[in-house]
Curated annotation (Swiss-Prot):
Residues 20-79 bind DNA. Disulfide bonds: none annotated. Residues 1-27, 273-301 are annotated as: Disordered. The gene is TPRX2. Transcription factor expressed after fertilization required for zygotic genome activation (ZGA), a critical event in early embryonic development during which the developmental control passes from maternally provided mRNAs to the expression of the zygotic genome after fertilization. Binds and activates expression of key ZGA marker genes, such as NANOGNB, ZSCAN4, DUXB, KLF5 and DPPA3. Binds to regulatory DNA sequences containing a 5'-TAATCC-3' sequence motif. This is Tetrapeptide repeat homeobox protein 2. Belongs to the paired homeobox family.
Length: 301
């Protein structure tokens, strides 16, 4: 029989041993003074120099190699800090901004707006310690009297408008107002309706027809009545479309009575007697002559 150990693979490799941390070397004051003295002479000593110095200080050569390496890094860090500008005390961290090196100059005249670098410059406000910009404070700027003149009624001071700060977002503007409909109310009582209403569309109203008066006859001296054939016939009305609500009257129906049937025909004898009586009456009164021309009172003048 085969050994079951041969069927299995090689044993799993164990975790590599961790590198032990080197203990921190503690130097005495006398050792530090000697190392500093040699560092001022040469910052990069070679192997032989380090070996001789290690025997003199009772140290290992590897310890001196690490000390010189750390001392060179410390010197480079100090030089880098000296080249950077000074920071405002109280602001620490990578996000802190450098303080302005140039102080803010005073205004040219009191009471006017402040322009540190000139009239065309602008200084942005510095944020607070929590990164919030301070609120704008209203200021009063006074203008000189010569600007507006003595006769002009200029104001003594103009109040600056503060910058808009953070505030609530205004509500959306409402849409166009709807026009309200008619106010519902009680409908007027029209009373009981006996039947369906018949709406009649009126036709064109004809003009009033005037009956012609008696026509005087210049030969016989009497008046003549016009016959039925001499009356003007009315024009036919416009045809209207048929509607179920229209009345039964047709457009051709005459809306006025026939005056010829109402007036009886006068005989010639009655006409002659009527005209003779009228002429005699005028002659007796003395106002109009037989020819009915003009009054006599006007001729005497």
């Amino acid at each position: 029989m085969q050994d079951p150990g041969h069927l299995q693979g090689p044993p799993l490799a164990l975790d590599p041993p961790r590198r032990q941390r080197q203990e921190r070397t503690v130097y005495t004051e006398s050792q530090q003074k000697v190392l500093e003295f040699y560092f001022q002479k040469d910052q990069y000593p070679n192997y032989d120099q380090r070996l001789n110095l290690a025997e003199m200080l009772s140290l290992r050569e590897q310890q001196l190699q690490v000390w010189f390496k750390n001392r060179r890094a410390k010197l480079a860090r100090e030089r880098r800090l000296q080249q950077q500008p000074q920071r405002v005390p109280g602001q620490r961290g990578r996000g802190a901004r450098a303080a302005p090196l140039v102080p803010v100059a005073a205004a040219s005249f009191p009471g006017g707006p402040e322009f540190p670098q000139g009239r065309g410059s602008w200084i942005s406000p510095q944020p607070g310690p929590w990164g919030v910009l301070p609120a704008a404070e209203p200021k009063i700027y006074s203008l000189p009297r010569t600007w507006g003149g003595p006769e002009c009624g200029t104001q003594e001071g103009l109040k600056a408008v503060p910058a808009p700060g953070p505030g609530p977002i205004p509500a959306p503007i409402p849409g166009p107002a709807q026009i309200p409909g008619p106010v519902p109310g009680p409908a007027p009582n029209l009373g009981p309706m006996s039947g369906p209403l018949s709406v009649s569309i009126p036709g064109p109203i004809p003009a009033p027809i005037s009956c012609p008066g008696p026509i005087p006859d210049p030969v016989l001296g009497r008046t003549l009545m016009p016959g039925p054939g001499s009356l003007p016939t009315p024009a036919p009305g416009a045809l209207w479309p048929q509607s179920p609500y229209a009345s039964n009257l047709s457009p051709d129906t005459q809306l006025y009575p026939d005056f010829t049937k109402l007036l009886p025909l006068l005989d010639r004898f009655e006409e002659s007697s009527l005209s003779t009586t009228t002429s005699q009456y005028k002659e007796e009164d003395g106002f109009v002559d037989k020819n009915h021309s003009v009054p006599r009172s006007l001729l005497d003048l």
